[in-house]
Regions:
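Short conserved AdoMet
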Residues: 9, 19, 36, 108-109, ...
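Catalytic-core segments of class I nucleotidyltransferases/pyrophosphorylases
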Residues: 111-114, 121, 126-134, 146-149, ...
């Protein structure tokens, strides 16, 4: 499928919508379901778009009354996401490692923090991911996932007869980085400057020093790199097969 270039002309990739909500919203809902509600967004390209979205979030979510006489506005929907969202402009051309370094002063007192890409969803159990990281006593934990193959596979026998056809089987391509990390603050020692690509020097250094733990996630995961990926996620939503929406599946 073609890249998301048309979608990202006027908005950053995490703001591309799946089911009328930005993909970053879906990611935040996953964390919130597991009780994690403090978010720091590393903004760069079109950062004002992200700021505007969250600035208007309450207004767009609720019925609202404007009292012009008293200069008041009242929201009329009871349930609100208990989120605390900090948006940090980390620069237009900063690489992934540099972006992480720029939010260092916004982190709380905990020794560890989550770091997640803004273009993929999954039904990752965030609490199990954290527990796995803490038990490892390592600086970083990466979630390994088994993406669906992009094409169906044909299996032939020795005589060239077609034995079976698998429609885009799960995990045919092997384990890949799913973009859901837990990091100890010691990671900042491994990030040199704005040009540091997190997936290169820092992660390779951790791996060489046996400081990179892996959490294996065998269930649903899907990145959104292309228009086809976006359409696939929307199709899953329409057919009530959005496995990443654990907050909907497990409503009491």
């Amino acid at each position: 499928g073609s890249r998301l270039s048309e979608e990202t002309i006027d908005k950053p990739k995490p703001m591309v919508e799946v089911g009328l909500k930005p993909i970053i919203w879906h990611i935040m809902k996953l964390y919130s379901y597991y009780g994690f509600n403090e978010f720091i967004i590393c903004a760069g390209y079109k950062s004002s778009y992200i700021k505007s979205y969250f600035n208007e979030y309450m207004m767009n979510l609720h019925d609202i009354t404007f009292d012009f006489k008293k200069n008041l506005k009242t929201y009329h929907k009871k349930k609100v996401d208990p989120w605390n969202v900090t948006i940090v402009d980390t620069g237009l051309n900063t690489n992934t490692g540099g972006r992480i370094k720029k939010i260092k002063n916004f982190l709380g007192d905990d020794d560890n923090f989550f770091m997640t890409y803004g273009d993929g969803v999954g039904d990752i159990n965030i609490k199990k991911l954290l527990d796995n990281h803490l038990k490892s006593n390592k600086i970083g934990t990466v979630t390994a996932v088994l993406p669906k193959a992009k094409y169906g596979t044909l299996n032939f026998n020795l005589k060239g007869k077609l034995d079976s056809f698998k429609e885009k089987p799960q995990g045919e391509g092997g384990w890949v980085n799913g973009g859901f990390f837990v990091l100890n603050k010691k990671i900042f020692k491994y990030i040199e400057n704005d040009r540091t690509i997190f997936e290169h020097e820092p992660l390779n250094s951790l791996a060489k020093k046996n400081q990179l733990n892996v959490y294996f996630h065998k269930d649903f995961w899907q990145s959104m790199d292309t228009l086809r990926d976006k359409n696939y996620l929307n199709q899953l939503l329409e057919n009530n097969k959005a496995d990443w929406q654990v907050w909907e599946k497990n409503k009491k």
